[in-house]
């Protein structure tokens, strides 16, 4: 997702302001959850020096530390985290934090709501399609991993959790950022910060007025990436890399003449006070020796990357965790099922982009969308 700035309309839950309001703005950029993150927050000023900046600095420091706290608690690759200990307990019960129990319960909820298309227990299968390894697993490897993953969801007690078998593993990578983004928003609001932009590696929450705007407007403009342009760019990068590896050497003119596609958003949404989360086939993928692209969104029914007609599924919701829990499932469903499914959930809106570039939307978001 790309954020473009505009001026939001007045929100009855917040103090009203003039269109020419001035803001004290602070931001924090950091690396967490294996991705780049950024939190920006603002306080309206009267154009004079105040202590607003000091408050923003402290609030943002606390927000970043909150993110690091959850990463330490839930990273499946971090030795000693609740999830690491659970995955290495050989099927034995392990003590866990109360919030770990909570997010595991929420994971079970989304698993049930999506008929198993969102499932944290699919970690053994997802690991086979690791885009960093760039290796296509054999059918036998996939079936064995599926057998392990299908043994079931963790058993959750008040302060303990237990995986069904010694080989079982889970990962909260598909839901943790949504949960954490919601906690960050709560923390900001507790300090009476009502204007903010939270971006946890693509889990985006917009709060209040778009304080970064140079020209006052009424709403945030949120750009949805075009899968076609991203895939074209990746293809160009692969071709350039192949030339560089050629035993005949690299012809600088050939690389220089390769024009990168102009990456314009597929559409722009005019929004206020919501979460925007996208699942896509183009962000984490690799190309095999035959030129086939394999992405990281695994269909639990097959153990292979989703083969639906969708290239991306964007969920607009009040809670970021809903965006996490449903966007992956919608992408796997395909455009027809996903659109009808989202229409049946009043708390969700969706923008679905097919592999050939067609845009489908739910009825509630149509007035907010502007195609490019």
Label the predicted regions:
Residues 1-372:
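Mature catalytic core of soluble alpha/beta enzymes
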């Amino acid at each position: 997702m790309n954020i473009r700035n505009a001026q939001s309309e007045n929100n009855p839950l917040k103090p009203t302001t003039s269109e020419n309001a001035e803001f004290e703005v602070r931001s924090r950029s950091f690396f967490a959850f294996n991705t780049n993150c950024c939190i920006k927050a603002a306080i309206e000023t009267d154009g004079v020096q105040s202590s607003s900046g000091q408050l923003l600095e402290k609030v943002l420091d606390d927000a970043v530390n909150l993110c690091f706290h959850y990463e330490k608690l839930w990273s499946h690759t971090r030795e000693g985290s609740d999830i690491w200990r659970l995955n290495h307990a050989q099927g034995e019960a392990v003590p866990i934090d109360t919030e770990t129990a909570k997010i595991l319960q929420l994971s079970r909820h989304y698993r049930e709501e999506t008929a198993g298309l969102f499932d944290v227990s699919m970690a053994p299968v997802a690991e086979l399609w690791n885009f960093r390894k760039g290796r296509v697993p054999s059918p036998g490897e996939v079936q064995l991993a599926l057998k392990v993953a299908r043994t079931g969801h963790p058993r959750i007690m008040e302060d303990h959790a237990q995986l069904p078998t010694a080989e079982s593993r889970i990962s909260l990578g598909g839901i943790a950022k949504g949960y954490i983004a919601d906690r960050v928003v709560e923390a900001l609001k507790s300090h009476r910060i009502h204007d903010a932009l939270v971006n946890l590696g693509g889990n985006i929450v917009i709060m209040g007025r778009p304080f970064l705007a140079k020209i006052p407007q009424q709403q945030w403009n949120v750009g949805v990436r075009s899968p076609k342009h991203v895939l074209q760019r990746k293809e160009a990068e692969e071709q350039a890399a192949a030339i560089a590896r050629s035993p005949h050497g690299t012809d600088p003119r050939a690389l220089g003449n390769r024009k990168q596609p102009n990456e314009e958003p597929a559409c722009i949404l005019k929004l206020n006070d919501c979460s925007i989360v996208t699942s896509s086939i183009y962000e984490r993928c690799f190309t095999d020796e035959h030129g086939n692209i394999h992405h990281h969104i695994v269909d639990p029914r097959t153990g292979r990357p989703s083969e639906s007609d969708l290239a991306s599924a964007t969920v607009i919701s009040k809670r970021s965790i809903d965006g996490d829990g449903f966007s992956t499932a919608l992408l796997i469903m395909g455009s027809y099922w996903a659109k009808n499914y989202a229409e049946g959930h009043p708390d969700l809106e969706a923008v679905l982009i097919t592999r050939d570039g067609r845009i489908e939307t739910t009825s509630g978001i149509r007035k907010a969308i502007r195609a490019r």
